[in-house]
Swiss-Prot record:
Protein name: NADH-ubiquinone oxidoreductase chain 4
PANTHER family attached to this UniProt entry: NADH-UBIQUINONE OXIDOREDUCTASE CHAIN 4
UniProt membrane topology term: Multi-pass membrane protein
Organism: Gadus morhua
Broad class of where this protein is predominantly found: mitochondrion
Length: 460
């Protein structure tokens, strides 16, 4: 654990002490070394599952894949942001890298926390760097509005969680994840325990986001700079799913009745947000709504609480993190060339940038869950566990899968095929940096096919 935490901490002085000429190469090299070092985590699962640094920080098979994903994403964010920050003053570039490094630090501490309150504090702390990145480096004036939505949705959702955790602490005397699965269930007034259950879940359902609490997400995604979109889609949404999995153990026997409305909402959301995607003209907005749709499946899988549901949810979270982050990078490469996110104004790019079309194709196929990609493994496991619970869910999930395929292909065809508009005849070529960025997103996704057991979490 320390071999990752200490270099991440030292990224901050590195950023401020390096000469301006070497700023990006050094930050990138150090973060890439951290990312490569974090892969060793996948190797050392102990018999109990927990590998603890001290009584507050440790890893287990559930948090390890998410930790590796968080570390893997920092160098990719730096690679993606290099171009659009090159015109900014040096101190602002340093500030930007500092914010991304602190965000990674908070994420490592959130996923590594074995104490519920520490997880809560880090869960909230990730808000600050993200908010600053969105409101300071976003592309349009609506970014302030988006930042406000992001802040207030998340804070309003997570205040009840704090109260619920304090009540749990009062009743059981501990909030350690190592002990709390063995504690007695919390018994409150007949209705009080139901409110307590909802308070525990709402914060994570807003973060995921569940359909109905998702309004902050498209706004935040569309207005954020590329690194903001990447980390939001790839890791911050996964904090919600991770928190739900951690708390689900404590919430039995209440969950049996309480999960029904949320599963219905999640599956309904898969269909509705998919349909919204079919009507989008804005590229980033389409990818953002597709995130809501995928996370709806994840929420359904977790709320079913079967081994298959949990495993499928974890696989889909990791796979979706890589695929949607790749799509945001591609949308950004388009935006940097055409200065427009509208799909009608930037089509026919296959003629101008043929190699980028290959990346678009692979990322779109990953998004629509083509076999044998891990996206399909996750979706199949979730569909099976939902079908096992009630056969009727197959109708909803089937329609959802169909719509996902439809909007993924629609996005690919709209942006890549067709005639090249007149105003786009002289585009700059694609850079090696962008190809490296896409390769580092999609190669891990393809390698997971060979050993999916790394992502099976508790049930490997």
């Amino acid at each position: 654990m320390l071999k990752i935490l200490i270099p991440t901490l030292f990224l901050l002085p590195t950023t401020w002490l390096t000469s301006s000429k070497w700023l990006w190469p050094t930050a990138l090299t150090q973060s890439m070394l951290i990312a490569l070092g974090s892969i060793t985590w996948l190797n050392n699962t102990t018999d109990t599952g927990w590998t603890a640094l001290n009584s507050y920080i440790g890893t287990d098979p559930l948090s390890t894949p998410l930790l590796v994903l968080s570390c893997w994403l920092l160098p990719l964010m730096l690679l993606a942001s290099q171009n659009h920050l090159s015109s900014e003053p040096m101190n602002r570039q340093r500030m930007y890298i500092t914010l991304l490094a602190t965000l990674q630090l908070f994420l490592i501490l959130a996923f590594g926390a074995t104490e519920m309150i520490m997880f809560y504090v880090m869960f909230e702390a990730t808000l600050i760097p993200t908010l600053l990145v969105i409101t300071r480096w976003g592309n349009h004036t609506e970014r302030l509005n988006a930042g406000t939505y992001f802040l207030f949705y998340t804070l309003a959702g997570s205040l009840p969680l704090l109260v619920a955790l304090l009540m749990l602490q009062n009743n059981t005397g501990t909030l350690s994840l190592l002990i709390i699965p063995y504690a007695k269930p919390l018994l409150l007034m007949p209705f009080g325990s139901k409110i307590w259950w909802a308070a525990c879940m709402i914060a994570f359902l807003v973060k995921m986001p569940l359909y109905g609490m998702h309004l902050w997400l498209p706004k935040a995604h569309v207005e954020a700079p590329v690194a903001g979109s990447m980390v939001l889609a790839a890791v911050l949404l996964k904090l919600g799913g991770y928190g739900m999995m951690r708390l689900m153990i404590v919430l039995d026997p209440l969950s049996k009745e309480m999960v029904y409305p949320f599963i219905v909402l999640a599956l309904w959301g898969v269909i509705i947000t998919g349909s919204i995607c079919l009507r989008q003209t804005d590229l980033k907005s389409l990818i953002a709504y597709s995130s809501v749709s995928h996370m709806g499946l994840v929420a359904g899988g977790i709320l079913i609480q079967t081994p298959w549901g949990f495993t499928g949810a974890l696989i889909l979270m990791i796979a979706h993190g890589l695929a949607s982050s790749a799509l945001f990078c591609l949308a950004n490469t388009n935006y940097e060339r055409t200065h427009s996110r509208t799909m009608l104004l930037a089509r026919g790019l296959q003629i101008a940038l043929p190699l980028m079309t290959t990346w678009w194709f692979i990322a779109s196929l990953a998004n629509l869950a083509l076999p044998p990609l891990p996206n399909l493994m996750g979706e199949l496991m979730i569909l099976t566990s939902l079908f096992n619970w009630s056969a009727w869910t197959l109708i909803l999930t089937g329609i959802g899968t169909l719509i996902t395929a439809a909007y993924s292909l629609y996005m690919f065809l709209m942006s890549q095929r067709g005639p090249l508009p007149q105003h786009m005849l002289a585009l700059p070529p694609s850079y090696t940096r962008e190809h490296l960025l896409m390769a580092l997103h999609l190669i891990p996704l393809l390698l997971i096919i060979l050993k999916p057991a790394l992502l099976w979490g508790w049930f490997a």
